Each structure stands twice: as structure tokens, then as C-alpha cells.
Amino acid sequence: MVVYKQLDEWIEHLMQCKPLPEENVKELVAKAREVFSNEKNVQPVKMPVTVCGDIHGQFHDMVELFKIGGTCPDTNYLFMGDYVDRGYNSVETVTLLVSLKVRYPERITILRGNHESRQITQVYGFYDECLRKYGNANVWQLFTDLFDFLPLTGLIENEVFCLHGGLSPALDTLDQIRELDRIQEVPHEGPMCDLLWSDPDERLGWGISPRGAGYTFGQDISEQFNVRNSLKLVARAHQLVMEGYNWSHEKNVVTIFSAPNYCYRCGNMAAIMEVAEGMDKGFQQFEPAPRRGAEGEVNRRTPDYFL
């Protein structure tokens, strides 16, 4: 049985960017599975809340995010997926977020991204990082099994619809999303896949996605979806935007990206969106945390050939 004192110790340990021992991860994930099992495909979220986009294993930048947005549980958070892959510290990043979820289940909402998948993590880094840090794939297996239970979308006060990717031609209403069976690996196609893979586009209607999964959707689609479901806004992540946030479709859609200097080379700002009482929306932008080497010195930006 995981108790608060134990969780607080784990969180303190993880905040130093140190992985938890495998047996602790196993205990944590068992408890987290119970928590996520009780959440819905469209998980209700109360305001005020701070909405965050992709993190991608950039642990020190996530710590910077908490400095700017406030610590959990003082601030209520909603994360829209992609905690792992690409960055150097996927293990510590996802373990900390899941620990916070188990410790403060009402103060942090963690949605599934397209990288919270067995197939994608075997290609983009999380699997290899688990092998490197634990000497086996057990922790990767524990987390990828847990990812199947993450809610697909969040709904802030019935007005702001939050998800990782975008809309689906197979889904007109939130009720249709509520009926999906989400407890599975991210499919290659279909409505659940689209929610995690699709992107807004300048072209109207539905389009074939250059990503090879999901669709592109135009302003006509997002406007219809918002009107039909009495929504004010679709908030999503999934795409690098240089300022950290980007409005599209005449403010029917906003993209939020929370990994600054993405992949340690893109030079972008990161942002979080604060939804206050009265549905006022404000953005906080931030730059990367200083990166420290093994001796504690601050490194220059890593040249491309080390990536």
C-alpha cells in the first residue's frame, strides 16, 4: 500500500532528477492504475487550471515549468500528453508526473499523447532509456501498460476541450468520445488514433495527414465541433510552435507546446495556458532551464552531432 509519506519521499527524490528503484516504480504504477481506471475518456476538470503541452523527457525544463506555473498541488494542472521520448530524462519525467497524480489526484490531470504508446517509445527513446537506466525493459513495460489507462481528453468547465492531437471525422460529439474503449495500445487508425495524432490546418475540411496517422482539419470543422458541443475552445499540443503557443482557426483552436528549445536545438519558447475563474486565459512563456553537466557546470547548447 502506497502511503502519502512514501509518495512525498519519492517526489523529493525524483525532483533531484534521480530515477526510482524498479520495485518502487512497480508499487507506484499499481496505485496509478487504480487512479486512472476511475477517470473518464472525457475527464472533467475544474478551473482555475494551468494547461501544458508536450514535455518529451526534458525534465529540467519541466521543473522550470513548475517554478513559473506554481508547484502541484498549489496549482491545478492539466498535461496534454507526450511526457516521454526525445529528451534525456523520460524516466524521471513520467515517474514524477505519475507520482504527483497518485499523491494529488484532484490537482493534476494527465492525458495520453501519441508517444504514450509501446510502438512509438521503442523508436524514439523511452525504451532505450529504460534499458540504460535499469538494465532491463521492466520499467518500460510497467509504464506502457499504464499508458493504456490514461484519459484521452479533458473538459474544463464544459467549455474548453483539451486533448493531445485533434479532431476525428468519426467523432462529432463528446458523447461519442465517452463511448470509446480506450484501454488499449494506440491504434494505427480510427477515432482514438485521430484524437492523439490529428492537426489543425489552414485548408478547410478533412485532409490526409503528412504524419501518416490522424487527419488535418480546417476551421470549418473546428467551428462546427465547438458549436455542436457548446464549447468555446479546443486546446491541444502535438506540434512545435516557436512562441510556445499559437492561436488558429480564428481562436477556435489553440496549440500549446511546453518543451523549450525542443530536442535541445529548435530554439523555441515554451508556454503554459492559465485558465482563471471567469474563463480568462493567459499565457506564460518560458525558456530552457540552464543545463548542467556531470560536474555541475552549465553547458553550452549541445551541437547537432551529439543528438
From Swiss-Prot:
PROSITE patterns cross-referenced by the UniProt entry: SER_THR_PHOSPHATASE (PS00125)
Coiled-coil regions listed in the entry: none
CDD domains named among the record's database cross-references: MPP_PP2A_PP4_PP6
Positions annotated to bind Mn(2+) 2: D82, N114, H164, H238
Chain residue ranges for the region called Disordered: 286-307
One annotated GO molecular function: metal ion binding
Cofactor(s) the protein requires to work: Mn(2+)
InterPro entries cross-referenced by the UniProt entry: Calcineurin-like_PHP_ApaH, Metallo-depent_PP-like, PPA2-like, Ser/Thr-sp_prot-phosphatase
Keyword flag Heme: no
UniProt keyword annotations, A-Z: Hydrolase, Manganese, Metal-binding, Protein phosphatase
Cofactor note: Binds 2 manganese ions per subunit.
Catalytic activity from the UniProt record: O-phospho-L-seryl-[protein] + H2O = L-seryl-[protein] + phosphate; O-phospho-L-threonyl-[protein] + H2O = L-threonyl-[protein] + phosphate
Active-site residues, record numbering mapped to chain: H115
EC number: 3.1.3.16
Basic and acidic residues bias spans: 289-307
Family, as annotated: Belongs to the PPP phosphatase family. PP-2A subfamily.
Protein name: Serine/threonine-protein phosphatase PP2A-1 catalytic subunit
Species of origin: Acetabularia peniculus
